[in-house]
């Protein structure tokens, strides 16, 4: 569809094909990002002069689609909101021969940003290579093998016919020199333009977080980036690189394993900000309107506050409302409806927070611990940490997980996140009251008892097989055995057992 269209999210299609409605439905089902198409046949148009057919068809198409339920990265512009300024800035950095880093939590939209950058570069007739470092095909390669991979990807992108010997020249001693020679050959063989190399999931090939030992605990990171950095310093017009990940530690730390970090402070760092109130209104209002849902500015403000401006959480909340009130369209979401939906939706939040914070807790436990300190109101310890580690506070602020209040105190950005962390770390607080200590002891005892029962059950079955129940009964006073004999061994060791 032409870019000059007034309405870019939907279109009317009139066809001679009598099964056009079914064909359009198949296309929409196969591509969730497909624009909304309202199909009619010529016969329908000629035979129906009243508006009933059109009203019915529009309702059927619009109200059946859940435009909020995108869980995969967005590959098209149709439903891409709130990030265009960042995309333009990153492309501008590349056009100025500057490197960049894009960082954010899981489900914050990093991969959608990459796709948007690729689309914009395509429009500008510029080239881009994307390497997914999460793939074993990337992170299992040694540094010199990955250099070879970059050359192959670059040659393929440029559709260059230049002859390059890739078989024998990419070992530890010769890879850096071969890389420079081959990249220059390819660059000079076609139209000369600066290519953007994007390294997605950069943590997978970084020290301490790498998915393979040679990246995590070896010097492959050092040698790989020494090569790319050295080439760039000699030939700044050939390529720039953009690193995409969760945490910019690979750029911020000056040394790794006693050696200088080749890309230390070499990239401008960009965090994916949470949506502003106006961006929430734009996204929710636009998509809701197409689905027959009216979200007023007051409801958008509540969504912004309750979800902390996180676009993924906002979309999932709106999707939940859509599915809850699916049979009522058009439908205005008022405060009472919203509050009811939010209360029901909160049970889904734990899995989303688990997913979003998993990388933080696994790879950057200090930042995660600081979140827990705030949730448990252990402000004194948090402030001590913050004083000694200001970069960690900056990361949490940039992720949109914490805010600095007017009196310079730090608080969690989402009430729901605070509740989640409190429940998950209920007894991690150091200064427990006597009542909290007793509750903690009771909970731990109950958990331990359940584990011991399972251990005993498995041990008896392993040792005695079908005779396990009989062996268990032998340990019980004779006057109680007959009463318990009718119970299975599972029942005897269950939570509701009559054994105790």
Predicted regions and their residues:
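Charged, structured surface patches that assemble and position nucleic-acid processing machinery
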Residues: 4-63
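Conserved adenine-nucleotide phosphate-binding loops and their immediately adjacent elements
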Residues: 57-82, 86, 262-265, 431
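Winged-helix-like regulatory helical subdomains adjacent to P-loop NTPase cores
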Residues: 75-84, 289-300, 305-391, 395
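P-loop NTPase Walker A phosphate-binding motif
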Residues: 100-132
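Conserved NTP-binding/hydrolysis module of P-loop NTPases
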Residues: 128, 140-165
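Mid-core helix/loop region of P-loop NTP-binding domains shared across ATPases and GTPases
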Residues: 153-210, 218-236
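The catalytic "switch" region of P-loop NTPases
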Residues: 193, 214-306, 320-324, 328-348
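Amphipathic alpha-helical interface elements
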Residues: 404, 409, 423-500
């Amino acid at each position: 569809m032409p870019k000059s269209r007034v309405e870019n999210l939907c279109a009317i299609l009139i066809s001679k094909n009598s099964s056009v409605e079914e064909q359009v439905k198949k296309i929409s089902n196969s591509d969730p990002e497909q624009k909304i198409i309202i199909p009619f046949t010529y016969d329908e148009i000629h035979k129906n002069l009243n508006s009933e057919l059109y009203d019915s068809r529009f309702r059927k198409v619009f109200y059946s689609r859940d435009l909020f339920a995108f869980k995969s990265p967005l590959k098209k512009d149709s439903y891409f909101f709130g990030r265009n300024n960042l995309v333009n800035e990153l492309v501008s950095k590349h056009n100025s021969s500057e490197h960049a880093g894009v960082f954010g939590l899981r489900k914050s939209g990093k991969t959608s940003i990459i796709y948007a950058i690729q689309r914009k570069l395509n429009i500008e007739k510029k080239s881009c290579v994307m390497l997914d470092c999460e793939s074993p095909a990337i992170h299992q390669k040694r540094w010199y093998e990955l250099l070879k991979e970059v050359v192959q990807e670059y040659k393929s992108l440029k559709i260059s016919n230049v002859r390059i010997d890739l078989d024998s020249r990419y070992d530890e001693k010769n890879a850096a020199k071969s890389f420079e020679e081959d990249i220059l050959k390819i660059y000079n063989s076609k139209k000369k333009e600066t290519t953007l190399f994007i390294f997605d999931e950069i943590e997978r090939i970084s020290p301490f977080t790498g998915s393979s030992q040679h990246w995590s605990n070896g010097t492959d990171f050092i040698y790989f980036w020494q090569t790319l950095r050295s080439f760039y310093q000699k030939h700044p017009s050939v390529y720039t690189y953009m690193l995409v990940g969760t945490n910019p530690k690979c750029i911020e730390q000056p040394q790794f394993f006693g050696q200088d970090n080749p890309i230390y402070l070499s990239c401008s760092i960009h965090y994916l900000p949470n949506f502003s109130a106006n961006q929430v209104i734009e996204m929710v209002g636009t998509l809701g309107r197409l689905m027959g849902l009216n979200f007023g500015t007051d409801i958008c403000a509540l969504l912004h506050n309750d979800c902390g401006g996180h676009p993924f959480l906002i979309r999932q909340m709106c999707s939940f409302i859509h599915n809850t009130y699916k049979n009522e369209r058009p439908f205005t979401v008022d405060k009472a409806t919203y509050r009811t939906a939010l209360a029901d939706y909160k049970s889904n939040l734990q899995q989303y927070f688990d997913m979003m914070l998993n990388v933080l807790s696994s790879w950057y436990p200090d930042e995660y611990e600081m979140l827990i300190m705030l949730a448990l109101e252990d402000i004194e310890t948090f402030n001590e940490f913050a004083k000694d580690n200001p970069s960690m506070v900056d990361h949490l602020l940039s992720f949109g997980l914490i805010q600095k209040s007017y009196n310079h105190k730090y608080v969690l950005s989402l009430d729901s996140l605070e509740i989640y962390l409190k429940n998950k770390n209920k007894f991690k607080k150091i200064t427990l009251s006597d009542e909290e200590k007793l509750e903690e002891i009771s909970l731990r005892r109950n958990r331990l008892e359940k584990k011991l029962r399972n251990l005993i059950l498995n041990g008896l079955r392993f040792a005695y097989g079908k005779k396990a129940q009989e062996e268990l009964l032998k340990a019980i006073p004779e006057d109680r055995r007959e009463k318990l004999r009718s119970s299975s061994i599972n029942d005897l060791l269950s939570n509701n057992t009559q054994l105790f």
